[in-house]
Every structure is written in structure tokens, then in C-alpha cells.
A protein has these predicted regions:
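Conserved structural motif at the start of ABC-family nucleotide-binding domains
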Residues: 2-4, 17-19
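ABC ATPase NBD coupling module
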Residues: 66-81, 232-234
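Conserved ABC transporter NBD signature motif
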Residues: 56-65
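ABC ATPase C-loop
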Residues: 154-155
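Walker B catalytic motif
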Residues: 166-168, 174
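Q-loop/switch helix immediately C-terminal to the Walker
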Residues: 86, 92-106, 118
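Conserved beta-strand-loop-alpha-helix hinge in the C-terminal portion
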Residues: 215, 219-242
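The feature captures the beta-strand-to-loop junction immediately N-terminal to the Walker
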Residues: 33-35
Length: 253
């Protein structure tokens, strides 16, 4: 179980998350939506302890371990994997070197023969040319190629909780299908949980979320299922009745 309890986070002396709460159980898919500036990306970056964001109070825990004050690499080693909307280029580092080093950081013994065999199988699954392994990380890659690169890391490193921040950004219809299909297949095989920040109807439909949350002013104000997502996308955030709505969807008398 992954839990965020009463999380308060600030950046540049401005409070962004103001009592954020979230619980994700094994194999669940959660969609997080909200207006611009509501704090969606801050949630993911706070989990990972991005240096720009300061947790001032609250708790983050995963599988019984308190991650509130953990270092980023400790969060990653706990089984949490992050895919953001703009994966960065890393000059001078080959994909193969990065992924092999990441496996070794988990304590796995990696011989080059079995590693290449595993990589080729993942490339086939993602319909990727294996030559990408000899390219520098994300260098000269399109948006779709970069997202596939991130999915490659998911299949290789086998995380149990995946955070996806606008993973559909810059992708065409076919690329979104590939992303969704891989996430569903991976979840079915491993029982992993997903926290997905998106406003893309086709991705939401394909992922079949268990829960949809709408965040505003740094906290979740509405919870529901995928109907909430589509109502919001069809009518806009301004159509939602925020006042008096509890996070279980009931009315506050």
C-alpha cells in the first residue's frame, strides 16, 4: 500500500500542496486531474524528493516504509518509478550503460549476455530497434521514442508503483495506444499500481482506472470513477461544484 497523509509542500516559499491525502492499493490505477497550477506534478516530484520542493509536514509511506525524508535513490530502490512528460537528454551516456547500472544499483548481478537477451526481448515487445541501446540517453529522440525509452526502463527494472506525469504529452494516437497497452500488460503481469496524471480521454478509457481524483488548490476535492473524469473533460473544471464536497464524493452538510 502507498499512502500520502496530510502532505504540505512548498516551493520558492509558496505553499503548493495543502493537506494532500492519497491511498493506492496493489494493482490499482489512479488518475489525478486538476486545473493548471493545482499541484498535480508537485505530488510526483514531492514523492521523489525533487530538490526544488520542500515537504514541510505530512507523511509518505510505501509498503510499510516511511519515505517522507528519504533520498531520491532510496525512493527508487523501494520500487517507485517515475515517467515524466519531458524525459531529458543525457549526453555521453548510452542507454545500455544507464539501464545496466540501474539494475546493478538494485543489487542484481548482471552478466552482459543475459542482459542483452533481456533487452532484445523488451525491444521486441515495444517494437523498438535494438540499436537504440547504443544511442545516448534520449539524445535526438522524438517524444514517442523517449516515452518508449521510459517504458523500456519499466519492463527492465520491474517497479511496483509507477508515477506517470502527462505521459501522453506530444504523442500521436498510435503512440498512446502503445503506451496504454504496455501499462495494462505490465500491470497484469506484475500487479503494479499506477498513478497517472492525464487529461487525455483515450488514455483514461484504455487504462480503465479504479479511482479518479480531482485536485484543486493543493488538495483532492473530488473522488470518483472514470465517469468523473469524462464529466470533467466534457464540461470543464469550472463546471464542478467544489464547495461542500468531501473527498469521498459526499456532500458536507
Amino acid at each position: 500500500m502507498f499512502t500520502i497523509s496530510d502532505l504540505h509542500v512548498k516551493a520558492d516559499d509558496k505553499e503548493i500542496l495543502k493537506g494532500f491525502n492519497l491511498t493506492i492499493n496493489e494493482a490499482e490505477t489512479h488518475i489525478l486531474m486538476g486545473p493548471n497550477g493545482a499541484g498535480k506534478s508537485t505530488v510526483c516530484k514531492s514523492i521523489l524528493h525533487h530538490p526544488h520542493y520542500e515537504i514541510t509536514s505530512g507523511h509518505i509511506s510505501y509498503q510499510g516504509k516511511d519515505l517522507t525524508n528519504s533520498l531520491t535513490d532510496e525512493v527508487a530502490k523501494s520500487g517507485i518509478y517515475y515517467i515524466n512528460q519531458t524525459p531529458v537528454e543525457v549526453e555521453g551516456i548510452k542507454n545500455m550503460e544507464l539501464f545496466r547500472t540501474a539494475l546493478m544499483a538494485k543489487g542484481e548481478k548482471v552478466d552482459i549476455f543475459s542482459f542483452k537477451k533481456k533487452c532484445n526481448a523488451i525491444c521486441e515487445k515495444l517494437k523498438m530497434d535494438p540499436s537504440f541501446l547504443t544511442r545516448n540517453v534520449n539524445e535526438g529522440m522524438s517524444g514517442g521514442e523517449r516515452k518508449k525509452n521510459e517504458l523500456f526502463g519499466m519492463w527492465l527494472l520491474k517497479p511496483s508503483l509507477i508515477l506517470l506525469d502527462e505521459v501522453d504529452s506530444g504523442l500521436d494516437v498510435d503512440a498512446i495506444k502503445i503506451v496504454a497497452a504496455n501499462l495494462k500488460e505490465y500491470q497484469k503481469e506484475t500487479g503494479a499500481s499506477l498513478l497517472v496524471i492525464t487529461h487525455q480521454p483515450s488514455l483514461i478509457e484504455k487504462l480503465e482506472p479504479d479511482h479518479v481524483h480531482v485536485i484543486k488548490d493543493g488538495k483532492i476535492l473530488l473522488d470518483g470513477d472514470k465517469d468523473l473524469a469524462f464529466d470533467t473533460l466534457n464540461n470543464g473544471f469550472s463546471s464542478l461544484s467544489w464547495a461542500g464536497v468531501m473527498t469521498d464524493g459526499s456532500q458536507n452538510e
